[in-house]
Amino acid sequence: MKSDKPFLERYFYDPTLLQKGLIFALYPFSLIYQGIATLKRKTAKKHDFKIPIISIGNLIAGGSGKTPFILEIAPRYQEVAVVSRGYQRDSKGLVVVSVKGNILVSQKTAGDEAYLLALNLKQASVIVSEKRELGVLKALELGAKIVFLDDGFRFNFNQFNLLLKPKVPPYYPFCLPSGLYRESIKSYEEAHLVVTEDKDYQRITSISRPTKRMLLVTAIANPSRLDAFLPKEVVKKLYFKDHAPFNLELLEKEFYQNNATSLLVTSKDLVKLQDCNLPLSVLNLKLEICPKVLEEIDHYILSYPYNTKERL
């Protein structure tokens, strides 16, 4: 836990001279990683599930807004399922998190992002599975006619690949471990649609229950990206590893040491604080997506013969 910018975020986005030396020393391993990742995707068995599958993905590791994007576009359709890996969940294998808004498992079983999707998508079913093809098959079994695949670019499915491109890219366009990319940046050319923040969509933020002295507590990737949306009432920032659980005793200690009047958390973090008795302020995030992006997704869905405008 640190209150300043985490080491890895500095390493990937604003490296020191020493870190730059380490980056180039590790570059041969990045080339190996890139080759394996590309070869694995290109040679994977092709799956065609005969329904529209929209993959919301990115090329960089960590957060880039995939969950907010799904939360914004999935409610536009009926008979929908969302399939995700369920990062940092306590469970293994395939788990049905919700069926048309009826939540069946706990946040720890689902993972924070999948649980957030289940809480907000009342018309959709949410499924987590390390093997995405099994998740899609379960979605079909539950009656889904449209599937949104969270972080699915690397899978060789017959799908519409939408890639989110960050407004502020990593410092070097290298693959892990010298950079933050999971595949070559040339892979953007293989997507059906690439969307960039402030060009194709805007982030709209608001704070529920704001107070005079808020202590920011978050466990998301690249947490300093929140800085642009934070009010002056934030007295301190506590950053935890992406998806990490919160120690409530530690939060309470920090809360009183900083004379805070509430904890400021994101919606993703909020689902892990159901047992927290401290006052909570919530940083809400919505996306305003360019109509042309939505039209392209509609066009893809309508290309399947049994989908009609009534389903949109």
Curated annotation (Swiss-Prot):
InterPro entries: LpxK. Keywords: ATP-binding, Kinase, Lipid A biosynthesis, Lipid biosynthesis, Lipid metabolism, Nucleotide-binding, Transferase. The keyword Nucleotide-binding applies. GO terms for biological process: lipid A biosynthetic process; lipopolysaccharide core region biosynthetic process. It holds the Pfam family LpxK. Pathway: Glycolipid biosynthesis; lipid IV(A) biosynthesis; lipid IV(A) from (3R)-3-hydroxytetradecanoyl-[acyl-carrier-protein] and UDP-N-acetyl-alpha-D-glucosamine: step 6/6. GO terms for cellular component: plasma membrane. It is an enzyme of class 2 (transferase). Disulfide bonds: none annotated. ATP binds at I60, A61, G62, G63, S64, G65, K66, T67. GO terms for molecular function: ATP binding; tetraacyldisaccharide 4'-kinase activity. Transmembrane segments: none annotated. Its EC number is 2.7.1.130. It catalyses: a lipid A disaccharide + ATP = a lipid IVA + ADP + H(+). HAMAP family: LpxK. Transfers the gamma-phosphate of ATP to the 4'-position of a tetraacyldisaccharide 1-phosphate intermediate (termed DS-1-P) to form tetraacyldisaccharide 1,4'-bis-phosphate (lipid IVA). Belongs to the LpxK family. This is Tetraacyldisaccharide 4'-kinase. The gene is lpxK.
